[in-house]
UniProtKB/Swiss-Prot annotation:
Catalyzes the condensation reaction of fatty acid synthesis by the addition to an acyl acceptor of two carbons from malonyl-ACP. Catalyzes the first condensation reaction which initiates fatty acid synthesis and may therefore play a role in governing the total rate of fatty acid production. Possesses both acetoacetyl-ACP synthase and acetyl transacylase activities. Its substrate specificity determines the biosynthesis of branched-chain and/or straight-chain of fatty acids. The last Arg residue of the ACP-binding site is essential for the weak association between ACP/AcpP and FabH. CDD domains: KAS_III. It is found in: Cytoplasm. It catalyses: malonyl-[ACP] + acetyl-CoA + H(+) = 3-oxobutanoyl-[ACP] + CO2 + CoA. Its main location: cytoplasm. Belongs to the thiolase-like superfamily. FabH family. GO terms for molecular function: 3-oxoacyl-[acyl-carrier-protein] synthase activity; beta-ketoacyl-acyl-carrier-protein synthase III activity. It comes from Paracidovorax citrulli (strain AAC00-1) (Acidovorax citrulli). Residues 253-257 are annotated as: ACP-binding. Gene3D superfamilies: 3.40.47.10. This is Beta-ketoacyl-[acyl-carrier-protein] synthase III. The gene is fabH. It holds the Pfam family ACP_syn_III. HAMAP family: FabH (MF_01815).
Length: 325
């Protein structure tokens, strides 16, 4: 009996509308909000991001990413027996975006559900899928991270609205007799709910509280670098590997400073870090699978290499997955 899981296909999707920093600066100026390309690049490393149109939902972006991943794995939607979608921007309050995506794919009948851990969501979802495959509850899972985060942005707050973008990434995770997912490590600390949140909710058809993103950037940075280092070392420990055994670090693409800080703590040079934040911005739960698909399709990440995926997000949540491609 297979006791392991392995990624057999990856995919990604970005909305056609691409905004460079210059584009966004011009739009914000119309609102009386001042910023500049230099200010954004120096603080975040971001040069462009993609925004979805009003009629495009997370399931739409996830569908394209899923189809690419299925094609890369050489499997049909009917072959999938588990669908997990990581998102903080679901199509509806309910049902889950996973169920909506399942219907669009034509993969009806298998378990389908969402995971909500914000920017750590894909790490959580991949870990859950791996656990279900190891237990025998599934053999071939579709794991998707998809976001239309632009819907949550306060475009009067230059410190946050320049950071985020929309997109989706997906993987097919299959049962295997040889290890693919080597180790995972998940954590959360609800004491830090307020440093990164969208505090609004719906009651009686009305929005209560603030429906837009709020973030204490300094607090997030201080927490993120420390916890990501611990999670990375935890999965290396569990797998019996060292930092030097990591071929590629694929971190959540939050901003270049957090990524540089994490790599430095692990003793990894930036030329072994997959970086897409410059072109995609922070796409929350989509950022890691987007970066993974980019690394695979560009030839950076190759079969047999060890990849360290790690993410941190609102909640406060964080985690890491170590895998052999």
């Amino acid at each position: 009996m297979s006791r392991y899981s392995r990624i057999t296909g990856t995919g990604s999707s970005l909305p056609p509308r691409r905004l460079t920093n210059a584009d966004l600066v011009a739009e914000l100026a119309g609102r009386g909000v001042e910023t500049s390309d230099q200010w954004i690049v120096e603080r975040t490393g971001i040069r462009a991001r993609h925004f979805a149109e009003r009629d495009v939902c997370s399931s739409d972006l996830g569908l394209e990413a899923a189809r690419q991943a299925l094609d890369a794995a050489g499997v049909q939607p009917a072959d999938i027996d588990l669908i997990i979608v990581a998102t903080s921007t679901p199509d509806m309050v309910f049902p889950s975006t996973a169920c909506i995506l399942q219907n669009k794919l034509g993969a009806n009948g298998c378990p389908a559900f969402d995971v909500q851990a914000v920017c750590s969501g894909f790490i959580y979802a991949l870990t859950v899928a791996d656990s279900m495959i190891r237990s025998g509850a599934a053999r071939r899972a579709l794991v998707v991270g998809s976001e239309v985060f632009s819907r949550l942005l306060d475009f009067n707050d230059r410190t946050t609205c320049v950071l985020f973008g929309d997109g989706a990434g997906a993987v097919v995770l299959e049962a295997s007799e040889t290890p693919g997912i080597l180790a995972s490590d998940l954590h959360a600390d609800g004491r830090h709910v307020g440093i990164l949140c969208v505090p609004g909710n719906v009651y009686g058809g009305q929005i209560l509280g603030d429906p837009l993103l709020k973030m204490d950037g300094q607090a997030v940075f201080k927490l993120a670098v420390g916890v990501l280092d611990k999670a990375a070392r935890a999965v290396l420990d569990k797998a019996g590997l060292k930092e030097s055994d990591v071929d590629w670090l694929i971190p959540h693409q939050a901003n270049i400073r957090i990524m540089q800080g994490t790599a430095k703590k692990l003793g990894l040079p930036m030329d072994r870090v997959v970086v897409t934040v410059d072109q995609h911005g922070n796409t929350s739960a989509a950022s890691i699978p987007l970066a993974l698909d980019h690394a695979v399709r560009s030839g950076q990440a190759r079969p047999g290499q060890n990849l360290l995926l790690e993410g941190v997000g609102g909640g406060f949540t964080w985690g890491a997955v170590l895998l052999t491609l």
